[in-house]
């Protein structure tokens, strides 16, 4: 039985459709592509999930703290928390997990998706070894701009490590 063909590139169009679908379905929040430039901020939260298997990479969702609180309020159908708490982190992680999960099912069979992790602030470095930014998509909604970044590991980088040879 043949599985899905391995896609080595996930199109920006596909990622945009996935993000739009997740935000509308889970928060009744329309999002639109934006050209706002990405820049690290001390006020940002970054959520990440990693995909591994026949295709390897990660999906990052980045927004400011205020937005994350607003997203949590919408997602949980409650007043938004006044500050970042575990509910806010859980919602941001779940949104990223849903984006990654939708991407996982569109790419190939046999991929695993990590648990989401959420980082607060910008004084850190996130490195998925061997990966490069494939796409960084900006979005706009009533809560302001946010970004989704797709990191992809080139297949040659998976076998080319001197540590594994």
Model-identified regions with their sequence ranges:
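N-terminal auxiliary interaction/assembly segments of multi-subunit proteins
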Residues: 1-165
């Amino acid at each position: 039985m043949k599985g899905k063909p391995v896609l080595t590139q996930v199109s920006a169009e596909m990622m945009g459709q996935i993000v739009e679908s997740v935000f509308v379905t889970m928060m009744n929040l329309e999002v639109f592509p934006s050209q706002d430039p990405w820049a690290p901020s001390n006020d940002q939260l970054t959520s990440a999930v990693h995909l591994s298997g026949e295709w390897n990479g990660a999906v990052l969702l980045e927004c400011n703290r205020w937005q994350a609180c607003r997203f949590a309020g919408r997602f949980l159908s409650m007043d938004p928390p006044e500050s970042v708490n575990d509910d806010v982190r859980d919602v941001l992680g779940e949104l990223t997990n849903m984006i990654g999960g939708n991407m996982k099912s569109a790419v190939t069979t046999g991929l695993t998706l990590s648990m989401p992790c959420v980082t607060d602030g910008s004084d850190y470095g996130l490195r998925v070894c061997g990966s490069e930014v494939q796409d960084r998509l900006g979005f706009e909604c009533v809560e302001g701009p946010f970004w989704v970044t797709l990191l992809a590991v080139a297949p040659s980088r998976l076998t080319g490590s001197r540590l594994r040879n």
